[in-house]
Amino acid sequence: MSTAVTITAPSVKHILLDSLVVMKIVKHVDSELHAGISEVSGDACAGVLTGLVFLEDSRLEITNCFPTVRNEPVMDDDANAAQQYEEQKQHEMLDMLRKFRTMNIDYEIVGFYQSHQFGAGFSHDLVESMFDYQAMGPENVVLIYDPIKTRQGQLSLRAWRLSTAALDLASKNDWRPELVKAAGLTYQNMFEELPIIIKSSYLNNVLMSELSLAKSCSSDKYSTRHFDLGSKKSLEKSVRAMMANVDELNKSIQSLTKYTIDKQRHDNMVFSLTQKRQQENESRVARGDPTIPMDDIKRIKAPQLQTRNGLLDELLASFDTNALADFSKTVTSENITKMFIAEAVAEEKVAGTKDRTLSSVSSTR
């Protein structure tokens, strides 16, 4: 990811997503979740997006997609497994694009999609993939699909791309605290979200309008399924993941604090030695003696942040924690609303029962 890349500011402002793409993504992810493939392999469901870019309207239209090859488990002594997997992945991708072209389907790659629970799963590999796609085309995006929210009745598809500042740091593959601070990069502006408009056919729109105007079934008239607080497991899982991220952030804060103290001590020491060397050289020049070079001072090793990817992991953990907190807040507020509604309905039923009891007693008298 350290290749020199000419960074071009993207011009796309919104995304027009075909309903066919939504159905294919949901079907792909749901089938793998039902089979337990994602849990066994540990990889997220992923695929490639194809479509067209309309620069005059600042619009990216995603018209089709297809899943990518899943990484198969390999033996420890198989050193060429990763290379074979990449070759197979590229071969099948090119073969699918060739079939799209033959069938007169949009075959221009405009991004990729991945499935992450609670919308939180941004990792170093995902950032590398986003950089590769945006280096290939500045308008390319990634669609993050949340199967948990979708199973609760709310389709969750969000489009992201790396900001210009994050793209610049990713091209250098250098996430040192000084560069991140100089770029003004935080977890809030590291990614840019684009609004999504889902496009359906005219017949589908007419059908949906008729269904919305149709009277509800009598079986659902008194149904209490809308009051079901069926999000306990997902909420618990979200809170546990958030606690794990907070623990990692606490460790990162301690490492960053230690690095800041060591860096300040190092800078003060280098400054002091430089001042002394300059004064000594001035006195040597006055005596006519040769000056002493400062190579030994420049060779003093600066402290390093004790993390593998600089501040990248901390930024991603902060972004994931924010996504998990938003999910927990949304679910909690919905559950509290349902509890208040259920309580009001129960009180109304109890009051109605008492009124009927009193009326029956008075009539018998």
Curated annotation (Swiss-Prot):
What is its subcellular localisation? Cytoplasm
Tell me the domain of life: Eukaryota
Q: Does the keyword Protein biosynthesis apply?
A: yes
- UniProt main location, coarse: cytoplasm
As given in the record, the signal peptide range reads: none
According to its UniProt entry, one GO biological process term is: formation of cytoplasmic translation initiation complex
Record key words, sorted: Cytoplasm, Initiation factor, Protein biosynthesis
Domain annotation MPN: ranges? 15-166
The GO molecular function terms of this record are: metallopeptidase activity; translation initiation factor activity
- One of this protein's Pfam families, by short name? eIF3h_C
GO cellular component terms attached to this protein's record: eukaryotic 43S preinitiation complex; eukaryotic 48S preinitiation complex; eukaryotic translation initiation factor 3 complex
Q: Which cysteines bridge via disulfide bonds?
A: none
InterPro entries per record: eIF3h, eIF3h_C, JAMM/MPN+_dom, JAMM_MPN+_peptidase_M67A, MPN
Q: Which residues form a coiled coil?
A: none
* Protein purpose: Component of the eukaryotic translation initiation factor 3 (eIF-3) complex, which is involved in protein synthesis of a specialized repertoire of mRNAs and, together with other initiation factors, stimulates binding of mRNA and methionyl-tRNAi to the 40S ribosome. The eIF-3 complex specifically targets and initiates translation of a subset of mRNAs involved in cell proliferation.
> Into which family does the record put it?
Belongs to the eIF-3 subunit H family.
Query: What does the subunit section of this Swiss-Prot or TrEMBL entry state?
Result: Component of the eukaryotic translation initiation factor 3 (eIF-3) complex.
Q: Which PANTHER family match?
A: EUKARYOTIC TRANSLATION INITIATION FACTOR 3 -RELATED
Its protein name is Eukaryotic translation initiation factor 3 subunit H
Taxonomic lineage is:
Eukaryota, Metazoa, Ecdysozoa, Nematoda, Chromadorea
Gene encoding it?
A: eif-3.H
